[in-house]
Amino acid sequence: MALIAPSPRVLRAREAPAAGALQPPAAACSTVAGGGGAAGRPLGMWSGGGGGGGGKGRRRERGDGMLRAEAYFWDVSKPVEMEEIDSMEKLDDALRWSVENKQPIIIDWMASWCRKCIYLKPRLEKIAGEFPGVRFYFVDVNKVPQTVVKRGNITKMPTIQLWKDGEWAAEVIGGHKAWLVMDEVREMIQKHK
């Protein structure tokens, strides 16, 4: 039986408990092929007994002895700390890097008093781990000269902008749910990469 995984996440196999039985959670995860009590047995096959249906007159309950696969979709990408832009020179350097390397950069325009901005920053650092060729920066609008803020044409926060070839290309204004913002940022990067 083929097993299709949408991403490099961890799969583990475990035996389904008998009806009404409590089973403690597994201590560790393992891949389908190795480890755990299900090593070497194919997924979705009966694990007990010989052929057909067990003994005469006995009926197997659904899930009894069945091997089940569970996927754990936690994020395995390592967060990358975003670099701070605190002057016009650093902004120009970041844009120059984008032009020289023909790669987009992401700039998170935020403020220290903005709760949504603070909440999104570690999530953006996780996304930075997913896109190794793209550099991620942040600008605290209260700590930089107004010329930097005007250059980004910032009116709302958090604003996450994608710059490519030294020019503004796209932006996401993060006033809605964090997971939606992160999905929009991923789409924006994939579109302009």
Curated annotation (Swiss-Prot):
Which UniProt keyword terms apply here? Disulfide bond, Electron transport, Redox-active center, Transport
Q: Does the keyword Electron transport apply?
A: yes
Q: Which family does it belong to?
A: Belongs to the thioredoxin family.
What is the designated name of this protein? Thioredoxin-like 3-1, chloroplastic
Active site as annotated: 114 (nucleophile), 117 (nucleophile)
Report domain Thioredoxin positions: 17-193
Q: Which InterPro entries match?
A: Thioredoxin-like_sf (IPR036249), Thioredoxin_domain (IPR013766), WCRKC1/2 (IPR044253)
Would I find Ligase among this entry's keywords? no
Which CDD domains does UniProt cross-reference here? Answer: TRX_family (cd02947)
User: Which Gene3D superfamilies does the protein's record reference?
Assistant: Glutaredoxin
Question: What is the annotated role of this protein in its UniProt record?
Answer: Probable thiol-disulfide oxidoreductase that may participate in various redox reactions.
Any Pfam family the entry gives? Thioredoxin
Q: Which cysteines are joined by disulfide bonds?
A: 114-117
Q: Name one GO cellular component term.
A: chloroplast stroma
Where in this chain does the entry annotate a coiled-coil region?
Answer: none
* UniProt source species: Oryza sativa subsp. japonica (Rice)
